[in-house]
Amino acid sequence: MPVDAAEYAAALRQYAAGVVLLTVRDDIDDVGTTVTSLMSVSADPPLVAIGLAAEGYPAEVLQSIGSCAVNVLGAGQAILASRFASAGRPSARHLLESVPWRRAPVSDAIVLDGALAAMDCTVHSVVPAGTHVVVLLQVEGVPVLADGDPLVRLRGRWTDGAGAPLRRP
């Protein structure tokens, strides 16, 4: 018996997820997208997995380039998460004009200086999964590691680590 799409979406909204900004530097520009489907896969070798819409440009660019940065966002970075979750967004560099960042050593992707953590990654493998792809990323380095409250997505809202909704600045 097929699962009702609305019930499926409602069930997943009950699951709190950390928020990351995935960035890729291609031959022309920088691409970034907000992702809530990050998980640790292995400590040796260090692998994480992300889910991306199979037909989306970020998945296409990531598979073509083969490397990226994964920036773990803090509770004070909800505006950034919203910017990079919007359809038809401009270059990542334009969306980060007032935000300090640098290049990751291996991927050359954007790493946010204010992220809680940033992982410099190469693509290990890609697994088709319905409307999405699951991308296994090998972590080549951790150029940013800080302490702070994480940004969390819960019930369609940005929240802090305790689940309290964040107010717009």
Which role does the model predict for each range below?
Residues M1-P169:
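Basic, polyanion-binding surface patches
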